[in-house]
């Protein structure tokens, strides 16, 4: 394969990757954990947070904090999995 063809292939792959990243940024992920619901987009921006009223207890805020951490971490993990699916494979360029 000559250099021009390799460069053209690399440019196409870059354009495809940018398109997929843009699509991922617009995608929404919904996570619900024991009364805590989070909606987060692929750009890792939280767009909605719902906390069931029963979880709001001034004497036990640690439980709510733990549930929020669990939900946030699961949301970020889902996005990372999607990012891994669209990441280019190093050997796909033929190197």
From Swiss-Prot:
One of its GO terms (cellular component) is cytosol. It is found in: Cytoplasm, Nucleoid. GO terms for molecular function: DNA binding. Keywords: Cytoplasm, DNA-binding. It holds the Pfam family YbaB_DNA_bd. SUPFAM superfamilies: YbaB-like. Binds to DNA and alters its conformation. May be involved in regulation of gene expression, nucleoid organization and DNA protection. Homodimer. Belongs to the YbaB/EbfC family. PANTHER family: NUCLEOID-ASSOCIATED PROTEIN YBAB. This is Nucleoid-associated protein MMOB0740.
């Amino acid at each position: 394969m000559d250099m021009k063809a390799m460069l053209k292939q690399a440019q196409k792959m870059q354009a495809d990757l940018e398109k997929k990243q843009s699509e991922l940024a617009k995608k929404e992920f919904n996570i619900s954990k024991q009364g805590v619901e989070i909606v987060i987009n692929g750009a890792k921006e939280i767009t909605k947070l719902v906390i069931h009223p029963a979880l709001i207890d001034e004497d036990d805020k640690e439980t709510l904090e733990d549930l929020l951490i669990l939900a946030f971490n699961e949301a970020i993990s889902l996005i990372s999995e999607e990012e891994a699916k669209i990441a280019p494979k190093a050997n796909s360029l033929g190197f």
